[in-house]
Amino acid sequence: MKTKHFFNSDFTVKGKSADEIFRRLCTDHPDKQLNNVKWKEVFINRFGQMMLDTPNPRKIVEKIINEGLEKQGLKNIDPETTYFNIFSSSDSSDGNVFHYNSLSESYRVTDACLMNIFVERYFDDWDLLNSLASNGIYSVGKEGAYYPDHDYGPEYNPVWGPNEQIYHSRVIADILYARSVWDEFKKYFMEYWQKYAQLYTEMLSDTFLAMAIQQYTRQTLTDEGFLMVCNTYYGNKEEVQITLLDIYGYPSTDIICIEQKGLPTPKVILYIPGGTQPFVEFLNTDDLKQWIAWHLKDNKHMVAFRKHFSLKQRQEGETFTGIDKALQYIAEESPEWPANKYILYNPTHLETENLFNIMMKRTEQRMLEDSDVQIRSNSEATRDYALSLLETFISQLSAIDMLVPAVGIPINFALSATALGLSSDIVVNGDSYEKRKYGIGSLVQSALFTGINLIPVISETAEILSSFSRTEEDIPAFFTEEQALAQRFEIVEEELHSISPDDPPREITDENLHKIRLVRLNNENQPLVVLRRLGGNKFIRIEPITFQEIKGSLVSEVINPVTNKTYYVSNAKLLGGSPYSPFRIGLEGVWTPEVLKARASVIGKPIGESYKRILAKLQRIHNSNILDERQGLMHELMELIDLYEESQPSSERLNAFRELRTQLEKALYLPEMEALKKQILQIPNKGSGAARFLLRTAMNEMAGKTSESTADLIRFALQDTVISAPFRGYAGAIPEAIDFPVKYVIEDISVFDKIQTNYWELPAYESWNEGSNSALLPGLLRESQSKGMLSKCRIIENSLYIGHSYEEMFYSISPYSNQVGGPYELYPFTFFSMLQEVQGDLGFEQAFATRNFFNTLVSDRLSLMENTMLLTESFDYTPWDAIYGDINYDEQFAAMSINERIEKCMNTYRGVAFQNSSKSIDFFLNNLTTFIDNGLTEIAISDLPYDIVQQEISQFLQGSNEWKTLDAMLFNLDKGDINGAFRKLLQSAKDNNIKFRAIGHSDNSVPPFNNPYKSLYYKGNIIAEAIEKLDREGQKFVVFADSSLLNSTPGTGRPMPGLVQYLKIPATVVDSDGAWQFLPDVASSRVPIEVTELENWQVLTPPQGKILGLKQFKLTAGFPTEQSRLPLLENSVSEDLREELMQKIDAIKNDVKMNSLVCMEAGSCDSVSPKVAARLKDMGLEAGMGASITWWRREGGMEFSHQMHTTASFKFAGKEFAVDASHLQFVHDQLDTTILILPVDDWALEIAQRNRAINPFVEYVSKTGNMLALFMPPLFTKPRLTRAL
């Protein structure tokens, strides 16, 4: 797994200082006006004052102690320079107490108070705090002097002094017991947030932007990532979705995930305030989760990461796991705590437009909760002091450092940050921190002691900032690039605009004696740039204000041979723009809601609810500018129109609605996709969720991004009753009182009174005296929940809310698990029977699912099926067949003794699979000792769904009684037998400390299935789970699974390997006579699924060649040169062939006849490439197929044309190398006069970049004459633009 790391900047801020970018992009607060030269001073002062006013527990302690002393008529003390000392021995003489070299612990009084030493010991044995011989409040701490010259006699050691106490310890303890530090803190806290909430919100947003700018200018944030961050900063909810990171359902205070909307596999950015690199980009959330898990293995990262969660969440309980334990389990890669499940376990989406206000409120609440824990308790569970707001301030100080480096903040950020945030081990410049960290004893090394001693560091920083006030002249002078250039190059600003590419460079010397040039480039938009020479004719661009290098921005100094003038050219900043998309779904031909109202108007007839939904959906479509969201909404609108026609077939509005539906179809499906459209829209009832997914899959397939899977996914959708159905379930709100994710809603429980069976009349419920099924329902739930079942069901205001999946209920509720007198009684079975009857012909998901659950169900099924098909791609049967493919292997297996078979399975193959019968389980248990002796570590079973019961399995194995659902499922599997085979299998795993894994698949689909596609889907997902959980080094396992899962079955386009083929183990069965036999993989099963009619659109991509990309290509690092092409050639072959390849290339380039073919005329490739091919043959080189490339280009306005180019090639070491003698007809480096030789794909990429090609397509054959003239990109790649662009 890798994060995205490319950097290809064409953003408008490139070439500017971080300071300049910040002022241009930040929101328009009064103190950030572009021309207000004092804005930095105001910015820093406000920030410092806010820090300085932060409620300070150390100051509060001082206030409480001295007010308590004054009430007793005692003198004040400074608790920061007064110490609570504990001695191991003492003696007295003439009323004085002498302590020798026996100081065991010493804390400043402030530290002792905040660590609750006095309050915790208040009701203990008070000998410690009352005894002058043991402890006291002293004016000197661990630096107490020794007096060896004072002779008290030979029996005494040197005396420790001064030896008089200021107060007895009990004096301070009484004050703290009578007055709560927490209550005092809370008062200051409320006043603080009332005053600074808005400013703190602004500071969060400013720091968010500043950190992004710093990363962007350092090239650790891509263009795409920076744009996503900016969209987040500006609250563009249409572009990005913000999710609060959570671990096992515990939300962090301030870590967020940013996802770009509208992409098939959205890119995601993780934002960790205080991290060394706060923004980390990933290709998907799975990579993000794995990255976090990896970093948690490092203790310093773990410590830092914990600080993003409140102390309240970090406490452990007997019945729940806190965040600390959850993180520990994830870091240890505990099988029961996989990172991909428990990171983002219960995602919470935040309002993008209100993000920083939300984060401010979360910080406020966190600070309140943490302070409660910190000040009230000093238990081991809470000893790690969370700096909360203070650490947030520290993470934001680098924004000030970016704006005004001269402030001199006394914190070394580089050493205080980790990848997962700030640790409390902050390094402070100088020795001030060590001087503060006075103290010896058991608590000195605790994180609590470290934390409370950082508060003075923050205060010192705040004082520096709040006092930082300078005149205009002292603030850095350059607030625009123009000002900087004018002053440094000693010209007036107006003259800058008149500098032309023809003018000679203006040159100065910087402080490092480097020659710095100011020139205007002679290409593209002719920007004014500052350069520093690298060597020869090469220069690097530098920022005008800071003189920092802009990486990758090379500029060449060239001479015009005609005029002999010197010019500076660069392609590092070509004019750019968003990539063109052939799949831009234009709405030019789709009515707006206003037009629809006019066309569908019926005099005297009001607009009904169905019509209102159509209008609302149409408005959302026109408001959306995200491709995937828009096409999904359009399919949903088509679905609404179909449902409207179904329910109101005689409506006078239908003609208008049908016309609108036609418009939507035309906008969604290109003419070239007509056959595909018919296939997708022939899905019964045209379910919008499936149509959205399938069109997106087809688009990706047409673009060459994915494999050929659309046809099989459509067949699967046609055979799945949920995928193919339109949504008819519940689209309303969920009451706040519901504390579980709701999957199904029955809006009015009176529907239970309309079913055929009167359950309330059954003998078991006669004594309840209920008069209807709906009246019976609350009692059924009450009694079921008292037995530990159906806990996620709630009736509120006559509506039933269900959080269990249908499959969970199906597997756990049955006549076997729910018998009268049994542990779970009859009530759940009655409830489930009522549900099954009330669903009618629609099916449970279609009738009652919530919109979110239904959409997720549809897309997840199709996505999982797509992954299942990927499992079959390029699967190599060879390793399995080499061992088990022998036609006589079953005889060899039978010839061995039982012990020999077990030993062979467990030591040669890492395991064995059994058919999941009670006979197989009994056989296994009878031989369990032998399996264990041969290293058995795990048992896996496909009859239990992992996502439903794996957690309860873990709880059972650990001795917990909380496994009701698992218990009920075992009753079901064992047909009510309390001593059944499956229960004995689980108990044996517990007794022998063997891991037990459920690998069954749960997706509201209940096997067995009759059609092969659904069987394939179910099988593939179980195999994927088994691979993830079992295919690891060091594991030895036994798997129990249905026989249809064990070996190969027909698959899509190729056979579907079985569980044993993937795990490379044998499949076995125990027959009715108790004989253990090998199950061979039948050759007749290794075939594709039979398809009666192969659709002509099944292969959507062009049969030859490939699309390089659906975007506009451009150069990113200047024109290619001989030197820049050299690595591409060297890396194309192995090192031992490199010299021979370069000799052939040199021969071609030095050949006189070949050089005579070089041509710069447009279109010359048609005539030149055959001559090049002929010359290559004459030179004794193996001729290649050549290559041709074609692309779109914009002619202006709305018009597009296509262009093409072709080349010859030669073969070497199995690769083809383009030899292009006509490439100079395209823009190029002025020093580039040679023949272009590159691997074919690299050649195509360079030609595309130099021509700013749009959606280029390459075929691996040279074309001439009519073949070249007719060569054009596939029509579906032609960009579709609107006038607005």
UniProtKB/Swiss-Prot annotation:
Q: What is its main location?
A: cytoplasm
Membrane protein topology class? Single-pass membrane protein
Q: Detail the disulphide connectivity of this chain as listed in its UniProt entry.
A: none
Subcellular localization, as worded in the UniProt entry: Cytoplasm; Secreted; Host membrane
The residues that cross the membrane are 402-422
- What GO biological process, any one, is recorded here? symbiont-mediated perturbation of host cell cycle progression
Q: Which GO terms describe its molecular function?
A: phospholipase activity; phospholipid binding; toxin activity
SUPFAM superfamilies, per the entry: Cysteine proteinases, EreA/ChaN-like, PMT central region-like
Report which superkingdom the organism of origin falls in: Bacteria
Which cellular components does GO assign to this protein? cytoplasm; extracellular region; host cell plasma membrane; membrane
UniProt keyword list = Cytoplasm, Host membrane, Membrane, Secreted, Toxin, Transmembrane, Transmembrane helix, Virulence
**CDD domains per record:** Tiki_TraB-like, toxin_MLD_like
An additional note in the Swiss-Prot or TrEMBL entry is: Closely spaced cysteine and histidine residues may provide the toxin with an affinity for metal. The sequence shown is that of strain NCTC 12178.
Function statement: This is a dermonecrotic toxin. This osteolytic toxin, induces bone resorption. Potent mitogen. This toxin is associated with the severe progressive form of the atrophic rhinitis, a major respiratory disease in pigs.
- Protein name as annotated: Dermonecrotic toxin
| Species | Pasteurella multocida
